[in-house]
UniProtKB/Swiss-Prot annotation:
One of its GO terms (cellular component) is cytosol. This is Ribosome maturation factor RimP. The keyword Cytoplasm applies. It is found in: Cytoplasm. Pfam families: DUF150_C, RimP_N. Residues 1-27 are annotated as: Disordered. NCBIfam families: PRK00092.2-2. Keywords: Cytoplasm, Ribosome biogenesis. The keyword Amino-acid biosynthesis does not apply.
Amino acid sequence: MSNAEATTSSDRTGTGKAEAESVHNPEAERVRALLEPSVQAHRLYLEDVSIHVAGANRVVHVVVDLPQEETGGVSLDVIAEISKELSGILDGDPSYDSRPYDLEVSSPGVGRPLTEPRHWHRARGRMVKVNVIQGENLTGRIQSVDDDGVTLVPEIAAKKGMKPKQGEPEKIPFDRIRNGKVEIEFSHLDEVGLEDENNGPSEEA
């Protein structure tokens, strides 16, 4: 049986078990295949599944996100609902032995690095820092995202006490982007998962 915990957080370890040993990747892939249909039925994207072992304890950590065409965050109510459903699926999995496990279901927090095209789609309209390969790093607001890259409206630093100016939109191809990170803005703190850069609200199911 499981102890299921629903969280919205960018902290991928969740319980602080930093010394837990990650289970061999094929097992995580098997669990992913087992859980993915249920996640998709909730119109969500299964971002990641990881399994960690610390002594006799196991932690199954599932990260779900909205589809890339949507903005905002996954609500805590949805996280709690799908957590209970996934717990039932794992409890009925004949491949799992009788050892107890903790199931943690979360959505990515604002601190998630932007490393894949879908991450950039999800961050449309947000202020981001872009780590550029062989070029000067940029800060600006994402105007649009397509198959080739990201169009950014750069933020130009101004004198102290003055608002930054906006530059002309600039297209950055994905092959020039190492990664990026969303900048926290006070106007977005009411969105799910943005209360804190590393830990959002949590609920134990």
